[in-house]
């Protein structure tokens, strides 16, 4: 009996332990598209659309120094884009257009991340495009990813 009481006291002592407070990071904020500068919106949309339309036409116009950062220009080569386009075209068909989903502002880096839904001929697989625009109105990252379909 004595052991049970001691065990219960120890259990009570550990169960009353104070909880750690979770710190919420306010540096990344969801922003309304109207609140973003039009030049940033247009830059993200135009470069994303130009990249995806090159999959339809097989002609890619390289990004300029005033449009994208050096890292993006080095990674966006004709060879890399053509191999990615072949995979995407096989799975999804021709590129039709972009639809803006949301805009996220990273306050620490002062960047805007634009997320677009990519519309293709085949509706079997959904893809998203994310374009990151810096404070200098240059694209610092472009990425596409396949979105898992939600079960019914």
Task: Pin down the residues of each PLM region.
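Exposed beta-sheet edge and beta->alpha loop/turn motif
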Residues: 105-152
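Sec-dependent N-terminal signal peptides
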Residues: 4-13
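Short solvent-exposed beta->alpha transition segments
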Residues: 62-107
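Residues that line or immediately flank small-molecule/substrate-binding pockets and catalytic motifs
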Residues: 8, 75, 146
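Short, low-complexity N-terminal intrinsically disordered segments enriched in polar/charged residues
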Residues: 17-57
């Amino acid at each position: 009996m004595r052991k049970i009481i001691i065990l219960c006291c120890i259990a009570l002592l550990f169960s009353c332990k104070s909880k750690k407070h979770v710190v919420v990071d306010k540096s990344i904020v969801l922003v309304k598209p109207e609140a973003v500068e039009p030049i940033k919106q247009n830059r993200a949309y135009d470069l994303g659309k130009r990249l995806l339309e090159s999959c339809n036409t097989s002609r890619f116009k390289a990004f300029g120094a005033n449009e994208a950062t050096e890292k993006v220009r080095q990674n966006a080569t004709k060879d890399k884009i053509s191999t990615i386009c072949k995979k995407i075209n096989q799975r999804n068909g021709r590129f039709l257009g972009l639809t803006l989903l949301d805009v996220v502002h990273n306050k620490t880096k002062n960047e805007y991340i634009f997320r677009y839904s990519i519309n293709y001929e085949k509706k079997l697989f959904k893809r998203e495009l994310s374009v990151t625009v810096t404070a200098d109105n240059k694209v610092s990252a472009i990425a596409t990813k396949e979105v898992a379909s939600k079960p019914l």
